[in-house]
């Protein structure tokens, strides 16, 4: 289960459901050592996709590597470097349910099936620029074959 958790987190790092998190400043904030201030009430868009693809935070960000989520690696990163469900008091209320439901579904499939990418899937993947959420151009098509016991 631990590796499945790392796998799931890496998928959401590379392909978060939404590319940004919206917030509103609850008070004035001035960046240390500058005169730059975000005023109370200012609407902010936090670029989760950009943060989670930043090579300074995640070396080789285009590489799929579930080990980015081992305990030591997570402890070494800023807690706001991973935002697939937002964070704080306004984070996604269904995040835990969605994660558990997805993991149970994955286990149910891979337990008795082999999963391959279908030839209809375009590789390398391209993002669909017309999609509001992160989606791949042409979709992802899979071939699922039942494995004999």
Per-region residue spans from a language model:
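Cytochrome P450 heme-thiolate "Cys pocket" and heme-binding signature region
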Residues: 72-102, 127-130
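Amphipathic alpha-helical interaction motifs in eukaryotic regulatory proteins
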Residues: 8-12, 65, 86, 103-111
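Cytochrome P450 heme-binding "Cys pocket" and the immediately downstream C-terminal segment
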Residues: 97-132
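Conserved cytochrome P450 K-helix E-x-x-R motif and the immediately C-terminal K′/meander segment
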Residues: 1-35
